[in-house]
């Protein structure tokens, strides 16, 4: 009955005892107790009594013991850009083979039969322009490496200055010469086709082009969503050319230089934890934008530009061009993500997600007889506790939780990075699926040019797949060893 005694067999919503739950985000020398006030007791019919229940039991903040991962070798910036440029050259070469192939095995009485490609139909100025665009990252990496400061010997300094001058002069002269010829040969409408991909820079980068300072700004120095929104609104009134100039300057300085690795602060303040997560979230989004824009730009110039400027008398396999666009974009994305999201960076995101925690929305009717607290942003909430926020009930899912229950971005951050190997597993699945598709297409191909194309592209992906598998095996053993060691200590 309504006012009777609750039955002994009545099941309640899963909730850990508050006196046993502990959590931390700090170093080992910190401890704190955080009572939570304003708690309401709920009756069976869901009506509040209006009385404050006793505060949560005193909690000792025990530091999270993060796993120490080994240092994995990463390619230097120039070597990485050289490998990426080689993959793009291979894809561009096989595309030209598919466009300008000949029937060279025919007898001399049948035209044409002397070369495997119709070299006289190739526009070499367009080819030079495409190669320079694909080599933009490599050129910038070489120039940055040659511009390094420090105590260098005089012959070494002379060599670096000479190399930088030679690379810039050769690239600039070739680019200007090819552009002059293209302006004389093609219409303005056709040349606009070359500039179309650069229009992605503004919508992708202008809203976050100056939130990072190259190593000079701490992630905990007051970065928040309000500050970011104010900065975006301040930039909104600028004219298009100034935004374009600022975007290009920031993009080149960040994209072509060594990516500064953010730092992780094991702090006890929930507000500082949320600010650190906000900074890391913006940094991760910036890197993903770089991956997306660079991969789409490279795939566009490899797959579509040669087709657009081909002569009308030449047959073009449009299906193969679209397939090549997908292969190049996915391959470039995986290679860039492995370079911009190294294991140390993914481990950093995992630590921040472990400190942030997560909330899961629950049905209020299932927990009407369970103690529910009013969520406040000043406290760390233990696992299993129920809170009320924005007229909804949430259950704490993390070891302890400082995330905002209604913030979807916090939930996404925890979902992607609470497992340290999730990003690496996604990359392995993408690369493995692409290699499997290429092997299947290679077995089904009947034309000689498609066989050569698929084989060359396939070999260019093996190196990236090997590096991903190596990182997965090493990191998997490191994290599993740390988890087993923690379980043994608990038992």
From Swiss-Prot:
It is found in: Endoplasmic reticulum membrane. Disulfide bonds: none annotated. Keywords: Endoplasmic reticulum, Glycoprotein, Membrane, Transmembrane, Transmembrane helix. It is a multi-pass membrane protein. It comes from the Eukaryota. The chain crosses the membrane at residues 79-99, 115-135, 152-172, 185-205, 290-310, 322-342, 423-443, 449-469. Residues 9-36, 44-56 have a biased composition (Polar residues). GO terms for cellular component: endoplasmic reticulum membrane; membrane. Pfam families: Tmp39. InterPro entries: Uncharacterised_TMEM39. Glycans are attached at residues 9, 20, 29, 45. Disruption phenotype: Homozygous knockout fish for tmem39b are viable and fertile and seem normal. However, adult males have a significantly lower standard length and body weigh. This is Transmembrane protein 39B. It comes from Danio rerio (Zebrafish). The gene is tmem39b.
